[in-house]
A protein has these predicted regions:
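Sec-dependent N-terminal signal peptides
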Residues: 4-15
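N-terminal secretory-pathway/extracellular module detecting exported/lumenal segments
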Residues: 18-69, 74-138
Length: 138
């Protein structure tokens, strides 16, 4: 019985990360890879909300190798707010370093040819897409 409980606990721990986030790669270049958790795309009162994960190819100035950001977006006028930023010392959001939540975040307008514009546009398009449509895009 004790072995069974140990096995079940181990399986729970190993699978708990995927329960909370299902990261889908949406962008990559020489410096970073950006993922979106499709399960967190939500709409409320004209804004959309989502979590992104950024994996850096080289450590940043504070020794971070990855970060998660919770964003608010306005699809109509292409602007975003960063609501929470969490930095990690390991790839894929492992070993938390710091969490920052601005008291009164500002709106930032995103040019269409920027990474921020791409992320907002992608999130807006995926918000109302069916599961099959989401799979086809990635």
């Amino acid at each position: 019985m004790k072995k069974l409980l140990t096995l079940l606990f181990s399986l729970f721990v190993l699978s708990s990360t995927s329960v909370f986030a299902e990261w889908t790669k949406i962008y990559t270049d020489d410096e970073e890879t950006i993922y979106l958790d499709l399960n967190t795309l939500k709409e409320n009162l004209g804004s959309i909300y989502w979590w992104n994960l950024v994996d850096l190819k080289e450590a940043g100035p504070d020794a971070e190798l990855s970060g998660k950001v919770y964003m608010q977006g306005d699809c109509a006028i292409t602007r975003t707010k960063l609501l929470t930023a969490i930095s990690y010392s390991q790839p894929m959001g492992e070993e938390e370093l710091d969490t920052r939540t601005p008291d009164d975040p500002n709106w930032n307008f995103q040019p269409p040819d920027s990474i921020g514009g791409f992320l907002l546009d992608t999130s807006c398009k995926l918000l109302n897409a069916s599961a099959k449509e989401r799979e086809r895009k990635f």
